Amino acid sequence: MFSGGDYGEVARWLANFVTSHAKRESPRVEAIVEAEGERENQSYGVRLRLGKRVLPPPGTPPLEPDFADVSAHRGDLAWCDALARRVRELARQLIAEEREERRSA
């Protein structure tokens, strides 16, 4: 497996990873990976979007994996499995909230 990489390369890998696992729950879920501003070269902000709904919602902290941690562990299957579980749980929560919103409308 692979690890390491510069900030941009790791950001692309993380965006693909999050997208892949979120879409396993629903192809309509989109990944948002924030990699600019205060986070640049330090960490990433991860959110998921389904329609107009975003989790974690704006104004609250996103999932925030550290650049060094992602870079060092992206080749570690156990670490990737733990991150995939977090992403998929967030996607399931987003889908459930959207369904509930449609039912009550």
Predicted regions: what is each one?
Residues 13, 58-60, 103:
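Long beta-sheet-rich domains in secretory-pathway and surface-associated proteins
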Residues 38-46:
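A short, glycine/Asx- and small/polar-enriched loop/turn
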Residues 1-37, 71-85, 105:
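Negatively charged, low-complexity tracts enriched in Asp/Glu with abundant Ser/Thr
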Residues 83-105:
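Intrinsically disordered, low-complexity regulatory regions enriched in serine/threonine/proline
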Residues 50-85, 89:
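Intrinsically disordered, low-complexity regulatory segments enriched in Ser/Thr/Pro
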